[in-house]
């Protein structure tokens, strides 16, 4: 069972429906016992970094423990950003710090938010993004991750090359929304299900 973490940030129904569409057993929950029992964790989310970290506070220990124990994890949009150490959006707020680095604002001169379809540039082999080369995915964000270690597997060009996906051991995360990205997005979720089964 895939546990989609409900921490009051974003439309969780669409990601749950996308997993069900590909035949995966997915449950939206904030119950730590269910998170512990799950085969994998998914952290979606939209909104502000600081607000998300405050809402995650009660689940932080469970979340970190499961990820550090090797449970497959997929972060989506804000769920990618909170993996990093800090964000320009919320100075002084600490992220989960599983991926060293910071989240920075899309530079001036670019329309913010970056909203709509954009193409992936695959920069490293990726289990999650197998078959996604040159595909278009749906993005909605004003900030992007800038990891300080070598975890970026895909970028997208929006006047500046931005992190589109990262992978580090059992941690997988996308800045784009696979659940809103048509068949290409469903393929990414299928790949995640295969990672869980491996």
UniProtKB/Swiss-Prot annotation:
Where found, per UniProt? Cytoplasm
Q: Where is the active site?
A: 77, 177, 179
The enzyme's E.C. designation: 4.3.2.10, 3.5.1.2
Keyword check for Phosphoprotein: no
Source domain of life: Archaea
Asked if the keyword Cytoplasm belongs to this entry, the reply reads yes
Record-linked Pfam families:
GATase (PF00117)
In terms of InterPro entries, this protein maps to: Class_I_gatase-like, GATASE, Imidazole-glycPsynth_HisH
Q: Show where the Glutamine amidotransferase type-1 domain sits.
A: 1-198
Record GO terms (molecular function): glutaminase activity; imidazoleglycerol-phosphate synthase activity; lyase activity
PROSITE patterns, sorted? GATASE_TYPE_1
Which pathway does it take part in? Amino-acid biosynthesis; L-histidine biosynthesis; L-histidine from 5-phospho-alpha-D-ribose 1-diphosphate: step 5/9
Primary subcellular site in the record, as a coarse category:
cytoplasm
Q: Name one GO biological process term.
A: L-histidine biosynthetic process
> What are the alphabetically sorted keywords of the record?
Amino-acid biosynthesis, Cytoplasm, Glutamine amidotransferase, Histidine biosynthesis, Hydrolase, Lyase
Classification via NCBIfam families: IMP_synth_hisH
Q: How does it assemble?
A: Heterodimer of HisH and HisF.
What does the UniProt record say this protein does? IGPS catalyzes the conversion of PRFAR and glutamine to IGP, AICAR and glutamate. The HisH subunit catalyzes the hydrolysis of glutamine to glutamate and ammonia as part of the synthesis of IGP and AICAR. The resulting ammonia molecule is channeled to the active site of HisF.
This chain belongs to which protein, by name? Imidazole glycerol phosphate synthase subunit HisH
**Species assigned in the record:** Methanothermobacter thermautotrophicus (strain ATCC 29096 / DSM 1053 / JCM 10044 / NBRC 100330 / Delta H)
Gene from which this protein is expressed: hisH
């Amino acid at each position: 069972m895939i546990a989609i973490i409900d921490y009051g940030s974003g439309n969780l129904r669409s990601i749950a429906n996308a997993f069900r569409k590909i035949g995966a057993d997915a449950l939206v929950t904030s119950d730590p016992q269910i998170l512990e029992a799950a085969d994998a964790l998914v952290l979606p989310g939209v909104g502000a970094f600081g607000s998300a970290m405050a809402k995650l506070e009660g689940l932080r220990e469970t979340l970190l423990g499961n990820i550090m124990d090797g449970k497959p994890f997929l972060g989506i949009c804000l769920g990618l950003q909170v993996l990093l150490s800090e964000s320009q959006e919320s100075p002084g707020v600490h992220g989960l710090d599983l991926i060293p680095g910071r989240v920075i604002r899309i530079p001036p001169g670019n329309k913010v938010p970056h909203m709509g379809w954009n193409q992936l540039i695959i920069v490293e082999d990726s289990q999650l993004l197998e078959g996604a080369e040159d595909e278009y995915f749906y993005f909605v964000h004003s900030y992007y991750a800038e990891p300080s270690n070598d975890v970026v597997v895909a970028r997208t060009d929006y006047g500046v090359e931005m992190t589109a996906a990262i992978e580090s051991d059992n941690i997988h995360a996308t800045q784009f929304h696979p659940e809103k990205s048509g068949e290409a997005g469903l393929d990414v979720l299928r790949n995640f299900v295969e990672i869980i089964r491996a």
